[in-house]
Amino acid sequence: THVKISHDIDHSRTVYVNGRQIVRTGDMMWMNWKKPGPSAPGPKGGPKTGLGKGVDGVAAKSPTLQKDLADLQKDGWNIEYGPKGGGSSANRATKTIVLDGNLQSNPNAATQVLSHEVGHAKYPYTADMSSKASYVNGTLADEGAATMKNIQVQREITAAGGPDIGIAGNSANHASYNNAYNQYLKDGNAAAARQSIGTTFGKGEITSTTGQPYADYYGGWYDKVKGGKK
């Protein structure tokens, strides 16, 4: 599936998940370029995923994911499958997480995507347009936060005897992502871990359209919108 790339600065983020890409549109993260349809009410009365018994069973092995799901649902977030090929998204504006309908038959992959999207949903991202460096670093830190959540959930699930849901992104970068997360476990510096993962992401994840590292890609967008201002 190819990602439709906009030249609008609001369309500013992409991450690979199971060979597909997630793009940011303002506060919304979505796979492919099709926006999902209207959201249905999320599950009530407990930290269920709303994505079926298979995903519930895998997600139940991660205390962190269970708590985050409960918190998000209490805060009014809805979680559901969208159309097949419609993409996966975390929309902060509408408090909606939608997973691509193609993931319904793969609970492990669905849980991986869910953990990543929950990471975005829980991270208080705001675009910082004060400078090129601030903007790029902010977008990549958001990816760092989502990746950290993915790793935390992955480890909790495997520690509880569940399947390895894997980590979103280029597999060549996973060692670096894990190293940054391990350092965070030692020193508790989440900001540094987000920055480290974001730096690797910015250099090591490549756009499918321009062949650029994402740090250069986002920086180019900033330059275009700001007229080259730093």
Where on the chain are the PLM-derived regions?
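Solvent-exposed, acidic/flexible segments
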Residues: V58, L103-S115, Y135-E143
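Post-HExxH zinc-binding segment in Zn-dependent metallohydrolases
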Residues: A133-A168
